[in-house]
């Protein structure tokens, strides 16, 4: 992913818990008028979202963008499938990798960059239950060490 990511609107924390993220890609989003307004307001949920390659195009499914509150009867469908904009080489690479067993395309975060909504898309491999427990133990150990240093600094 490029160095300068813009303002992060939404993150998929569950993806980092359930998957090993091997590569990340920056993809543009094809949106309707009221969708970008809802994204700017931060009313988007990536929790159950996933991406698929279909006919040489990448589509994101189950990404929930709430309807725009000031919108009229032409408001968008919150759960519609949305197209992602990637280079052809990236799409071919993702299509080949996603066909392998255990790999998935997972949306990681949505952010604004130069006025455009972008999505960080991760090529991910699923974690087993023991991997999740191991990561949780490591996280707790780091937290205990940080707490011990903080308490020592106070004395």
From Swiss-Prot:
Q: List the SUPFAM superfamilies hit by this protein, alphabetically.
A: Small protein B (SmpB) (SSF74982)
Does the record carry Cytoplasm as a key word? yes
Alphabetical list of InterPro entries matching this protein? SmpB, SsrA-bd_prot, SsrA-bd_prot_CS
Entry's Gene Ontology molecular function annotations: RNA binding
Q: State where it is primarily located.
A: cytoplasm
Q: Name one GO cellular component term.
A: cytosol
The cysteines joined by S-S bonds are: none
Per UniProt, the keywords (alphabetical) are:
Cytoplasm, RNA-binding
Which GO BP terms, alphabetically? trans-translation
Q: Which domain of life is it from?
A: Bacteria
Q: Which Pfam families match?
A: SmpB
Q: What does the function comment of this entry state? A: Required for rescue of stalled ribosomes mediated by trans-translation. Binds to transfer-messenger RNA (tmRNA), required for stable association of tmRNA with ribosomes. tmRNA and SmpB together mimic tRNA shape, replacing the anticodon stem-loop with SmpB. tmRNA is encoded by the ssrA gene; the 2 termini fold to resemble tRNA(Ala) and it encodes a 'tag peptide', a short internal open reading frame. During trans-translation Ala-aminoacylated tmRNA acts like a tRNA, entering the A-site of stalled ribosomes, displacing the stalled mRNA.
Enumerate the NCBIfam families for this protein.
PRK05422.1, smpB
Which PANTHER family is this protein grouped with? SSRA-BINDING PROTEIN (PTHR30308:SF2), TMRNA-BINDING COMPONENT OF TRANS-TRANSLATION TAGGING COMPLEX (PTHR30308)
Family, per entry:
Belongs to the SmpB family.
Q: Would you tell me the protein name for this molecule?
A: SsrA-binding protein
Q: Give the lineage.
A: Bacteria, Bacillati, Bacillota, Bacilli, Bacillales
